[in-house]
Amino acid sequence: AAMAGIVFSINAFVGVWLVAMLSFAHVCARPPRAGAAETLKAVGLFALISAPTAVWILDTMTGDDARVAFSYIEYIRLYFPHHFLAEAALAHEIAKFLIMTYAAVVAALLLDNTRFWWSVLAACVLLVAAGVVLPYVVDARPVFNLHLLRVDGVVQFVAPLLIVIAAVRALAGVDKPFVEALGAVCLMALTSAQRDGGPILVALSITLIALARRGRASSLRLADLRVQRRLVALALLPAIALCVVLDLRMDRFDWLPALRYALMALVLIGALQVEARRLRMPAPPAATLCATLLALCLITVAARLDARSDTQARRETLRQPYTELVEWIRSSPLEGRFLIPLDDPFGSREFETFHLDARRPVWVDWKQGAAVMWDPSFHGLWAVRFEEVRALADDAARIAYARANAIDQVVLESTTCPPGSSQAYGNARYSVCVIQP
């Protein structure tokens, strides 16, 4: 309770999440000594610590400056939809969240305080579900300020902890070599959990560990070397290959993940070899598959290293015109506001730090929209300007708009300036156009 109060005082919406999780866990997995008196003490301690922050928040949300005269959901759609709205969530990110949540639930099954962790995970899922629905039902500032969709970050924090504990127990336990190998694979896969394929390996390996350690009939089957061989050949190695394919598709494949995937395959095959020797059986034919996979990984790395270095060099080359632009503006005598290209939160964000890089004020940019969260009255200025600038069709329209609004300079994604302006600076991609009187 004290920690929840401190967290609330530092970051109120995270404090609200924590209170919801602890309350849900208290109801569903009540500690043996947690009677009514202990519960009241905890509530009182939280209220005492969080009261100053709660009073300040209440004051800011009920004052004249807090009145919202616009649709909050439309503001979010204009500013930063994928931070608040389920409609902007990417399918592969949703899939990763669901898979890692499942893996955490299975890992909790292998721990001593299973019910408590299941309650915490259930509370997180319920909060995320509320974050999916509430913005479309209640168009109010507090709903968005709670950032309920961001509770997935708590799951991303809790899930690896539970999985690590369960995997380490499997690795250091008294189980068969195959289960120990699954623990090692699970830990290595966890280092790839942010990649598209990583959660698949985590979920698969932790599920097999749970079946081996908790399921009676399943344990008997997993102890069979023939079953282990089939699992490696038909499930685990194809899952590793899928991770390689997904990394290649996302241009994230280099020597480190290749080494990691190869080690996973080697650990699995090594466990089968150890088990075969223990049982005095022939070596598993899957060793050939492992060697082939390792060779493919190494060949792919060799083919990708040059391409990766070329990609990095190309990114630096593409960034160079912007760097030259802001360096020139920073050292130039030009003063006053700049009209700059608008960034897209889903695409390019090259100009989001222009005012800091160039040390000059801007007429409007995408990043300014964040200020509406703290000062709703700013919406009337920012949204109007943002929509107006976004609607400008070409460079000539931008120059005309700048003249109509007494904007001194315009940065264009062009090497020349339209009539009505003079070019103060230009490079391979950008021009600084000064509005003529």
Give the ranges of each region predicted by the language model.
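Membrane-water interface at transmembrane helix exits
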Residues: 24-25, 29, 165-172, 272, ...
